[in-house]
Amino acid sequence: MKRLFELDVLRGVLLLMMVVDHSSSSLRLFTDQPFGFFTTAECFVFVSAFLAGLLFSKRAEERGFAAARSASIHRAGRICLGHLVTLGFAFALGGLFLSEFPGIRNLLDHYLRNQWAAIGGAVVLAFRPPLMDILPMYILFSFLTPAAFAAARQWGWKIVLLFSASIWFVAQIHVRDLLITAFEGVSFIQLGPFDLFAWQLLWISGLFLGQRFYKGKTLLPLPVLHPLLLLCTVAFLVWRWSSIVFGSDLVAQTWLLDKWHLGPLRLVNFFAAAFVAARLLKYLNRWETLLRPLSLIGRHMLPVFCRPDLLHTGSHWPCRVGLDQRTDDLCLSTLPTGNGATFSIVPGIRSTTEAFRPWRPRVRARSLGN
């Protein structure tokens, strides 16, 4: 199956936006929930699940379910290894050289208190420091993907979706918070803010739509609902920017739009916007050459994804020695964004150069012949 250029571009854009979101740059105004009450995290999880569902279905049809299951687990293992290498570098950098800086102490507080316990917790994905908490969620969901497809084979996708929605519903009463309270003070457990009981609904939905896409089935709802979804997307967009321009919005701060537990209105906003985006993505092929660097960033997302996390960890310290407060604030706001964006874009440019390299000798030979 041919790679989906549109999704590669989308993942590249999401990665660059995520770099800015994890910085203190003023550009966050335009990258942090710019299209409504959802962030790049929801998009990243959903798009990744969509591709996982598509690829699992393709492998299962061509090589059998066992081969698809093995490939899915193998990929999850590779991503887990990349995450652990990234985390290990952050531990070494922060623990050996930068532990006296407040920013590093905030990021790696549990690790600095009990290093061996934190390392053990990281291996089993129970220790997830800030800025490095979304990949463990992705890894866990990837390991569970074969189980979701096995359940769908046995009982059908309706049952799987209903079960997933039920878990999400239970998550709205903050069951996870009770578990965190029970393990409070345990040095090797730092689960991060994401409620996996809620976020699994995005993953299961992405798997479901990915396998439908592979089978050529319709992904969009009934045509009669299309105007309603568009109107819903515009309404949330206006609401979001109104809350930014005119100040605090009390409703936006309630559980209905909660990010970590995926409040119901937040889900409605995301899926409505996803419908609109799906209708627009097909037009990206018209600018394939122009958007090629972004598509290559998205195609090589795993190695690129790990680099901004390392840079954000390191950029908490360089400007904190011997500078006045104004210069200090300027450095802290620009370093993460500049470093992260640079190390995200460079692989795309390098890959683009490699893509055009095979044509160079041919052009040169023709010139010599003339």
Where are these regions (language model features)?
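Alpha-helical transmembrane segments and their immediate juxtamembrane cytosolic regions
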Residues: M1-N370
